[in-house]
Amino acid sequence: MIAKLTGVLDSSGTDWLVLDVAGVGYLVFASGRMLSRLPTRGEVMSLFVD
């Protein structure tokens, strides 16, 4: 199971984001609350997966 991802924010939508981790793009579905707190595209971020 994946517990944490750290990478570059590639893109995001109304209920998802793509996090580029070492060249692999992870599609992560997330709440609007979490998505409203995202950094700018291209910045490094970490997220814990529940």
Locations of the language-model features?
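A positional/architectural concept
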Residues: 1-50
